[in-house]
């Protein structure tokens, strides 16, 4: 199928859902050659992915992952053991309501495309498939994207994959998260209903900061910044960025009636020490 798909894509024709899923199955099962995989990913990227092509690719990738992934380097620097087996991660999620899913332990079939992606050096559909292929099968999700044009299409993809409450965000200063230095484009999902809108830091009582103020450093430096935020020592733009994104997640999870309420809850959880306590618990339990 991959040969036929490459020809079709090179002619700027869209693949059907079934064709895209079949190609992904061939790739994930090691049936495609390196040349075929490279040609397919390049042709798909050059044509531009449709909603059906992304949805089918994510479904195919999900089918090949171990069931039950922003930065694992920071978690490691904080002391979290990140490469736990799936069974232990599932236990942590049940016992303390938090875990980290190390991609290499779940998306084993990615070994067939990882070298190709590195050599190509361009963004491909796999850049967005990871968050869409959550091994836990979460039906509530906050996802950041790297291009404005992906916001609404990926919200539709998430809904087709079973997400009932979700939010796709793009910081207009080219951040794949809710930004403290620019407006953020949002597409919210609720039981098959979509709403697109824009939010700004000022809506939540925050003073906009420069993008440079949010830049981190080494994993160790970022881990220290994280601790300063959770200890209540950092009260500038970095803390506000954390509260905005955590607040959105709290709202999407149904724990707040609005994002405004979610942001206020995030602030309170930091201020009363619950967030720091949860991190310390996560570190301790992950190392048992």
Tell what function each PLM region has.
Residues 8, 14-15, 63-66, 70, ...:
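Glycine-rich anion-binding loops and their surrounding alpha/beta cores
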Residues 1, 9-70, 241:
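N-terminal glycine-rich anion-binding loops that anchor highly charged ligand groups
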């Amino acid at each position: 199928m991959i040969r036929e798909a490459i020809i079709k894509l090179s002619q700027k024709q869209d693949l059907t859902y079934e064709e895209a899923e079949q190609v992904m199955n061939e790739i994930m099962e090691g049936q495609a050659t390196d040349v075929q995989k490279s040609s397919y990913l390049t042709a798909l990227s050059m044509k531009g992915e449709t909603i059906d092509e992304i949805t089918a690719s994510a479904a195919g990738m999900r089918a090949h992952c171990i069931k039950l992934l922003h930065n694992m380097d920071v978690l490691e620097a904080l002391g979290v053991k990140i490469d736990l087996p799936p069974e232990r991660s599932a236990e942590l999620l049940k016992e303390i309501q938090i875990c980290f899913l190390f991609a290499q332990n779940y998306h084993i079939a990615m070994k067939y495309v990882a070298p190709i992606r590195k050599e190509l050096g361009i963004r491909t559909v796999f850049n967005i498939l990871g968050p869409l292929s959550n091994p836990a099968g979460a039906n509530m999700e906050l996802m950041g994207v790297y291009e404005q044009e992906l916001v609404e299409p990926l919200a539709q993809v998430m809904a087709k994959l079973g997400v009932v409450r979700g939010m796709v965000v793009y910081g207009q200063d080219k951040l794949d998260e809710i930004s403290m230095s620019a407006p953020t484009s949002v597409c919210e999902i609720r039981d098959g209903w979509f709403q697109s809108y824009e939010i700004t830091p000022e809506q939540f009582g925050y003073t906009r900061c420069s993008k440079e103020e949010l830049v981190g450093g080494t994993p160790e430096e970022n881990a220290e910044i994280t601790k300063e935020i959770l200890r209540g020592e950092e009260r500038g733009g970095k803390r506000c960025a954390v509260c905005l994104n955590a607040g959105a997640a709290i709202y999407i999870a149904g724990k707040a009636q609005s994002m405004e309420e979610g942001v206020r809850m995030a602030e309170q959880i930091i201020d009363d020490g619950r967030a720091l306590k949860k991190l310390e618990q996560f570190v301790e339990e992950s190392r048992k």
